[in-house]
Amino acid sequence: MAGVLIALLAIVVAEALLRRYVWRRPTDLRAVAASLVDALVRRGGDLLGLSMLAPLPAFAFAHRLATIRMESAAAWGVLYLLVEFAYYWHHRLTHRVRWFWASHSVHHSSNELVLASAVRLGWTGRLGGAVAFFTPLVWLGFPPQAVSGLVAAGLFWQFWLHADWMPRLGPLEWVLNTPAHHRVHHASNPEYLDCNYGSSLIVFDRLFGSFVALRDDIEIRYGLTTPVLSHNPVRIAFNEWLALARDVRAARGWRARVRVMFGPP
């Protein structure tokens, strides 16, 4: 995994330099550097095992309802759809529940869409435990390695969605989550907020009413609705957590505080 991370970070740096010095496109190299630091610190946390919910998949698999052998294309196809479904709802909740948004907002904090945006994921995501959304699949009987492998494959697909120079993909736009769909997802324009949550598929967005197509008549603005202008990785990582803490402290009564924490951002 370390080799994969090094390769991805090298691609991030190469794209940033190409954009700035060859393609002559505006590129914030300080923002790219902040994203690289974010990724390296998060990798350090991964090595330390800083996840409150890390034991969950092993516990669920030990008490699984069945044993599903991944020996057929059908088994892999079913698991792929279930992983995509779980990812869709987890991603949607990270936009609609402020506690989750406090971590996920880091990913949206870059004011441009470049490959560096793909590795800016913050340092607190594991404390919330996205793994909880995929653990039910392990409990059903799918091997944890198969589940985590498909999740990782989806994240690798999404890495390339952050390249704003990639063209539209024709008929594939109906089924797959594409760079065009992801540009909409990262936009802060009112017309584009809270949409296109899929991993590698866009079909669940179409089914559940969260799909928004890219429009040629709207100039995209990337980043948060209240932009983060700092290049300090620590400020970027905890910007929304501090805002959440201020709002919780200002709320009157425990019910109001719960609404602040678990209501929409």
Report the location of each language-model feature.
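Hydrophobic transmembrane alpha-helical segments in integral membrane proteins
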Residues: 1-9
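Membrane-interface helix-loop junction between the first two transmembrane segments
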Residues: 14-33
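Alpha-helical membrane-anchoring segments
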Residues: 16, 42-58, 231-234
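Helix-boundary and loop/linker segments of multi-pass membrane transporters
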Residues: 25-29, 65-72, 106-107
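Membrane-interface segments at loop-to-transmembrane junctions
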Residues: 28-40, 109
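Membrane-embedded catalytic scaffold of the fatty acid hydroxylase/desaturase
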Residues: 41-49, 70-222, 227
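Juxtamembrane/interfacial segments at transmembrane-helix boundaries in multi-pass membrane proteins
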Residues: 52-77
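Cytosolic-facing loops and C-terminal tails of multi-pass membrane proteins
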Residues: 218-265
